[in-house]
Regions:
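N-terminal nucleic-acid engagement/recognition segments and initiation subdomains in replication
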Residues: 1-117
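Generic detector of short, locally flexible boundary/turn motifs and exposed helical patches
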Residues: 22-40, 119-126, 168-175, 215-216
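Residue-level signal for secondary-structure boundary elements
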Residues: 31-32, 50-54, 127, 131, ...
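Structured core elements
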Residues: 70-72, 157, 205-206
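Short, flexible loop/turn elements at secondary-structure junctions
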Residues: 75, 162, 209-211
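Short helix/loop capping segments that flank catalytic or ligand/cofactor-binding pockets
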Residues: 79-82, 167, 214-215
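P-loop NTPase catalytic core of nucleic-acid-dependent motor ATPases
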Residues: 87-201
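Conserved nucleotide-sensing/catalytic segment adjacent to the nucleotide-binding pocket
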Residues: 194-216
Length: 216
């Protein structure tokens, strides 16, 4: 999404939106392009569209969009109908912004029952205080990449003493399973910094060592 004030509807700014040939074909003049006419039409079209609502912008991640699922991977959308390039018109009241490409799950075959069983076995081998914790961890890993499409987003808090291996579980088990459909940050990250990084994305956030060092 590019914000263009009224005074910036000039040749330099407009050719950044579309190539010169586009403007020459729509607004020809003896000297090249009738830029005032192009700016006038853009102003009228903008007024006809109504007030822009920033909350309609959607970043990368999984979304629920009027009865259908949409997986936004930066440069393309994955819907039940197939893959849709982000630069092509897409029927929706929301605006799916073009962003850095994510690989996501595309091109990867789903795990077989036997392969999934290996993952379950690894999760259950960690030294849990409560045996069901391995299953709970896997449940969160499965739901986390589609958190944006869920009405309620599950949270997971991994607790243990210092040096017990929490970071190892996150780095060597959780992170490889999530792939690039997650944001990994350290405990020193501020709320403002986190909001700025996430922006409009709907991806799970993994905090490493998100614990207080203050003593009460």
């Amino acid at each position: 999404v590019i914000r263009l004030p009224r005074g910036c509807h000039t040749a330099t700014h407009l050719v950044a939106l579309a190539p010169l040939e586009y403007w020459e074909s729509l607004y020809p003049s003896r000297t090249g392009v009738n830029w005032p006419a192009a700016a006038s039409d853009l102003h009228k079209s903008s007024a006809a569209m109504g007030i822009f609502a920033a909350e309609r912008i959607r970043g990368r991640g999984a979304w629920w969009d009027e009865g259908r699922t949409v997986l936004h991977l930066g440069d393309r959308l994955i819907t039940p109908e197939g893959e849709h390039p982000i630069t092509k018109p897409f029927r929706s009241r929301h605006i799916y912004q073009r962003l850095k490409r994510l690989e996501g799950p595309c091109g990867v075959e789903p795990l077989t029952v036997q392969e999934a069983g290996v993952i379950v076995g690894i999760a259950n081998r960690f030294r849990w205080e409560v045996p069901a914790s391995g299953t709970l961890l896997l449940g969160w890993v499965v739901l986390a990449p589609i958190c944006g499409a869920l009405r309620w987003r599950p949270h997971l808090w991994l607790t243990a003493g210092a040096g017990s291996g929490k970071s190892q579980i996150l780095d060597r088990f959780v992170a490889p399973l999530l792939g690039d459909l997650s944001l990994v940050v350290v405990g020193a990250t501020t709320e403002a910094g986190l909001r700025q990084t996430i922006c409009c994305d709907a991806v799970p956030v993994v905090f490493d060592e998100a614990e207080s060092i203050e003593k009460g």
